[in-house]
From Swiss-Prot:
Compartments, record wording: Membrane
Top-level lineage group: Eukaryota
GO molecular-function term, one example from the UniProt record: mating-type factor pheromone receptor activity
UniProt source species: Schizosaccharomyces pombe (strain 972 / ATCC 24843) (Fission yeast)
Phylogenetic placement of the source organism: Eukaryota, Fungi, Dikarya, Ascomycota, Taphrinomycotina
Inducing stimuli: By at least 3 types of regulation: the mating-type of the cell, nutritional conditions and pheromone signaling.
Family: Belongs to the G-protein coupled receptor 4 family.
Keyword annotations of the record: G-protein coupled receptor, Membrane, Pheromone response, Receptor, Transducer, Transmembrane, Transmembrane helix
Function: Receptor for the peptide pheromone M-factor, a mating factor of S.pombe. Pheromone signaling is essential for initiation of meiosis in S.pombe; M-factor signaling alone may be sufficient.
Transmembrane segments: 7-24, 31-54, 73-100, 116-133, 155-182, 204-226, 265-283
A single BP term in Gene Ontology: positive regulation of meiotic cell cycle
GO CC annotation, single: nucleus
Membrane topology, from the record: Multi-pass membrane protein
Main subcellular location: membrane
Protein's name in the database: Pheromone M-factor receptor
Length: 365
């Protein structure tokens, strides 16, 4: 394996490790758009890093396995991810736009069907529409993995290359509109976020900045992909002969000495998400908790000094959580007692109009 391949292995796997606390945070927050974006990013990163390790020797004259069965599935997942990643980021912007235009907090899981359809169903439909234009089952690129191979037609341009551009451009439009609305309604939104238990002002701005940086980087990338594919070969007119020639070409293996641009995008976005979510207070604690749990779980570190230290840290975290929970219960009990005393004091201090109470009071005069 070349040095660039070794570096990519560490780069991608560390991005997957950093995505675990983000996934935990978003599951607790029940943020469906972020979970959909994490789904596509982690799945494609895992596919890229595994396949780049399988076909890692560019100087091999022949390869023993052409990926039969595995590449039939992963190549189509990669095709779906080219639409699913910008679509799920677009649903995140739609969610923020819905929040900022409402005068009351959103209901939990509101519009989740629309988000799932746009992020999952739309990529599956586009992938199914592109299957008849496959020149062969897939191609295997060394240090990159398996990719679908399409005939370059105007049909491919319209249904495969243009949708990511439109989704990225729409995301930039909604981001700019959200920024304008937030600037105009800043005072009203501060009161709104105080009423909403699921979304605070910091969380809203964090998600907005994440979406803005994502689309500012992803939109030029989609334009570059369209221009690059257009320069490499001309787009042919669509005809039935191309459909009849489906899978007529054999599976091709391309030896290369570099990792393609597509393989770097998903792990880089995971690093970007980790950077933004690391500004939250509990992110570092969650990362440390996951790492300590991993050291305790691994058999070759469980009985070592490092494993015992990790177990000590986990026990300390559990004791702190139980102490904080006890203090919370004590504070709630104290508040309830104060409310009861306040009600009793108000009843005794406010005179009543009941004549029986006046008669009882006259006995002691």
């Amino acid at each position: 394996m070349l040095p660039i391949g070794i570096f990519y292995q560490f780069y991608a796997y560390f991005a997957l490790v950093l995505s675990i606390p983000i996934l935990y945070m978003q599951l607790r927050a029940r943020n469906i758009p972020c979970l959909l974006l994490l789904f596509w990013l982690t799945l494609t990163t895992l596919i890229y890093v595994v396949e780049s390790a399988i076909w890692s020797n560019p100087y091999a004259e022949t390869i023993r396995w052409m990926g039969y069965g595995l590449c039939d599935i992963t190549s189509r997942i990669v095709t779906c991810s080219s639409i699913g990643i910008p679509a799920s980021a677009f649903t995140l912007v739609l969610y923020l736009d819905t929040v900022i235009r409402r005068d009351h907090p959103l209901k939990r899981y509101e519009n989740w069907i629309w988000h799932v359809c746009l992020s999952i169903l739309l990529p599956l439909i586009i992938m199914a529409m592109m299957v008849p234009l496959e020149s062969n089952r897939y191609v295997v690129i060394c240090m990159n993995g398996c990719y679908s191979s399409f005939y370059q037609t105007w049909y491919t341009l319209l249904f495969f290359y243009i949708p990511p551009c439109l989704l990225s451009f729409g995301g930039l439009f909604f981001v700019s509109r959200i920024v304008v609305l937030y600037w105009r309604r800043q005072r009203e939104l501060q009161q709104f976020f105080q009423r909403d238990s699921q979304l605070t002002s910091k969380r809203f701005l964090r998600l907005l900045c994440l979406a803005a940086v994502f689309f500012l980087g992803y939109f030029p990338l989609t334009i570059f992909m369209v221009v690059a594919n257009g320069k490499l070969q001309q787009f042919l007119p669509f005809n039935h002969e191309l459909v009849e020639a489906w899978h007529q070409e054999s599976i091709t293996y391309y030896p290369t000495t570099k990792v393609g641009l597509n393989d770097w995008v998903p792990p880089t976005v995971l690093y970007l998400m980790s950077l933004f979510f690391s500004t939250s207070g509990g992110w570092t604690e969650k990362v440390a908790l996951i790492l300590w749990s991993l050291l305790v779980w691994l058999p070759f570190t469980k009985n070592t000094a490092l494993g015992r230290h990790a177990q000590f840290k986990l026990d300390c975290c559990k004791s702190i959580e139980s102490t904080m929970a006890g203090k919370t219960l004590d504070s709630t009990d104290f508040k309830e007692k104060c409310l009861v005393l306040e009600r009793q004091w108000s009843k005794s201090s406010i005179p009543s109009d009941n004549s029986s109470e006046l008669q009882d009071a006259a006995k002691y005069v």
